[in-house]
Amino acid sequence: MSIELRTKYGQIDISNEVIAMVAGGAAVDCYGIVGMASKNQIKDGLTEILRKENFSRGVQVRQEGEQIHIDMYIIVSYGTKISEVAHNVQTKVKYTVNQTIGLAVDSVNIYVQGVRVTNP
């Protein structure tokens, strides 16, 4: 599925995978995020074997009419305030998708799938 944008110059189709990669890249940069939880373990397992970076892991993009919703499955660092990390991810993802692609995201839903202890 893709999102269609119409401009005075023509039509632009943006795939959900591109939006997911932009959103995932923004989320990974946030403080307190250890990683993204896998939504498709077979595909992501093969990607890990091939050592290819996959920013779209744990990101689902849904379009309902004119609204765009992003679901993110994250793993947070132990000792961080989960609500603050989630809020920071929501804010950064909305801003980054808007600045990079020019799309207004209606909602960014955060699903914390785990907490991991990291080495200082």
From Swiss-Prot:
It holds the Pfam family Asp23. The gene is yloU. InterPro entries: Asp23 (IPR005531). Belongs to the asp23 family. It comes from the Bacteria. This is Uncharacterized protein YloU. It comes from Bacillus subtilis (strain 168).
